[in-house]
Amino acid sequence: MLSDNQLYEQNNKLFGKTKLFIIALFLVADSRFFYLLPLPDIFGGVASNKTFIGLVSLICFIWMALVTKKINVGKYVNLILFLYVFLFCQAFFEKYRFQYSTSSILFNLIPFLLFLMYFTINTFLDDKKSFKLFCLLCEWTTIFLSICLLLQLLVYNKMHFLFLNFTLSDWYTKYHVTASGRFAGVSEGYIRIAVLISFFNILNGSRKGKGIAISSFLLAISDIIFVDQSRVYIIQTVISLFFMYLIAKKNKINVNVILTIIIFAMLATVILIPKFNSIIDTLNNSSDGSNYARIGAIYYYLSFIGNYLFTGLGEYIPDEGTSQYYFIKGGQGIYNFDDIGIFGVLASMGILILIWYLLVIIKNFRLSFLIKDRNEKALAFGLSIMMLTGIFTASYLDRERLISLVLTMTIINFCARESNLNIHHG
């Protein structure tokens, strides 16, 4: 027979493992289990299809609430609740203004259930130990995901064969079947946060587990450079990492730090100069496809968004070929909300959510300033800078980057809460 104390310890271990499993399930579900498992069409296809992770987030939220009998709301709760109220109201507008079907509108909102994971992860992160476990889970997930994506890139470039379960754009499948691949979107959301988490653990100084952090970091960087290949994304990452390093090493400037900064600056220069030149060439070339579409989209949406200022055009994109599709996507069907940052937020969700988005960024920085732990402050600022630098090109309200926003809110909230607890306990 087990004593009461032994039963209590046994239940505690089971309780802890259950919570850990819930978080692990969420992390691997974002990439649809590293894109290895074939899922029904409703959940599969392009990497930006976040229907599956939305439903998993709902399940994880309910499961965590049942297991813990509580939910920690944190410092972003009012912003998240406002977003949900807005989406509910916007759904009514879409229904009666554009005559979309109720099922289409509601189905399109499923990815936003991902914000429930803010509460779920907050409930899991109740102390420093749980945060270390969370970071370790992120690192292992990053290692497996990055290896899968890098191997897929290698195989595709050599054999033009996809073994992972995501759909490539028409550029590859229809027009340039033998072209070398770049898999835009598959690394847009989770990896951009994971690379900062890995760098945070490298900066932390503890040798234990640093090998995992370094492996995760290098693989994530390789993923961003070789798999995603977005010039702006690479620049965002370098800037965020640079500021993280400066903040973490504040008051510790010595010869080693100066040498590291010099080496970092040299490597960054080698990486960034071609990217800057490429961006400048693109901006100067009005006939460049992506540049033409982005500038055209901004002018197009701004020309009439005043008529939809408080509601936006909505999140639902009608079927191609319909008049409503070409109204949303432009006459050529080439304009996208997710290509134009906050202009896309304004076009799709209106002025209220544009203000909401800016308030989130401001809150990120305000909370980051309050954090006392140097390395946690560096991580919080890295997350804040990553979001800020993508303001005109990569909105965190786009489907593939919703997880970036959820993890940014969650991590900054935890670090700020820990600092507040330490102040009171001190």
Residue ranges and their predicted role:
Residues 20-28, 218, 366-393, 408:
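Loop-to-helix entry and N-terminal half of a specific, functionally important transmembrane alpha helix
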Residues 135, 140, 211, 242-249, ...:
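Hydrophobic transmembrane alpha-helices and their immediate junctions
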Residues 1-68, 86-94, 230, 387-389, ...:
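N-terminal signal-anchor transmembrane segment
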Residues 76-88, 98-123, 133-142:
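Aromatic-anchored transmembrane helix interface
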Residues 97, 146-188, 325-333:
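Membrane-interfacial helix-loop-helix modules of multi-pass inner-membrane proteins that assemble, modify
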Residues 281-349:
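Long extracytoplasmic/lumenal interhelical loops at the membrane interface
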Residues 197-199, 242, 379-391, 395-426:
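Transmembrane alpha-helices of multi-pass inner-membrane enzymes
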Residues 135-159, 182-229, 234-247:
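Alpha-helical transmembrane segments of multi-pass inner-membrane proteins
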